[in-house]
């Protein structure tokens, strides 16, 4: 009997020219490199066939960033699936999962950003920290925290529904380096909680086009104030779930995607 504890499987897109060089890639719509394509084909083979970490029958939704590099990664990872298996999985393009909007820092390296900010008279008292300071003419940490909190609320709402129906539910999220590390951090409560009060925070934003995904209105959201100190290289996979089978106890699965089969009695994360 499979575990009924839902999981959120986060997947960073494969290698691009800018992920290889370390340039900040937000709205720039780069494709995967040939290496990145092969990388994600191998990942799909590993998680679906060799490792058997993912059962296609348990995948209820895939949410993806609209950027080409993320959508290419979805297609490549799903290659091992049959047409019938693939047809049963709903793929939802969700603009809330786009990468951090870097503004003036798009295409730059970290050292170049630090020099630019220094030339503008910034960071005299403490060094730049994107998780706290955001990006000039791009997104603040509050703005990205708000939209990722919306995405998390929708996924956790779906998990709650599927669990109540007795269905196994793996939901996959394909996105980007900064966005997914931020997503993982606030999934289980890092950062600070802020009540939705401003027009931007309380407005109804539907960032996807799929009527099977219920809209969830936020009363509050979370945003970071420091680096969560997570690593997720291009092509990397992480696992988020819930402690004690309880949707109200979101947790990080430290073992990641390569785990021993759970004991039949404990099922998943029960102690």
Swiss-Prot record:
| Impact after mutating residue 16 to A | Impairs catalytic activity
Describe the reaction catalysed, as an equation: D-sedoheptulose 1,7-bisphosphate + H2O = D-sedoheptulose 7-phosphate + phosphate
Record-linked InterPro entries: His_Pase_superF_clade-1 (IPR013078), His_PPase_superfam (IPR029033), PGM_Phosphatase (IPR050275)
Q: Which UniProt keywords apply?
A: Carbohydrate metabolism, Cytoplasm, Hydrolase, Nucleus, Oxidoreductase
Q: Which Gene3D superfamilies match?
A: Phosphoglycerate mutase-like
Record: residues binding substrate:
12, 24-25, 69, 99-102, 181, 244
Please give the biological process terms from Gene Ontology that the record holds.
ribose phosphate biosynthetic process
Could you name the active-site residues? Answer: 13, 99
EC number(s) per UniProt? 3.1.3.37
Q: What induces it?
A: Expression is correlated with levels of ribosomal proteins, thus periodic SHB17 expression coincides with the peak demand for ribose phosphate that occurs during ribosome synthesis.
Acyltransferase as a keyword?
no
What is the main EC category here? hydrolase
Subunit structure and binding partners: Homodimer.
**UniProt-reported outcome of changing residue 19 to A:** Leads to reduced substrate affinity
Hydrolase as UniProt keyword: yes
Localisation per UniProt entry: Cytoplasm; Nucleus
| A cellular component term, taken from the record's GO annotations | cytoplasm
Q: What is the protein name given in its UniProt record?
A: Sedoheptulose 1,7-bisphosphatase
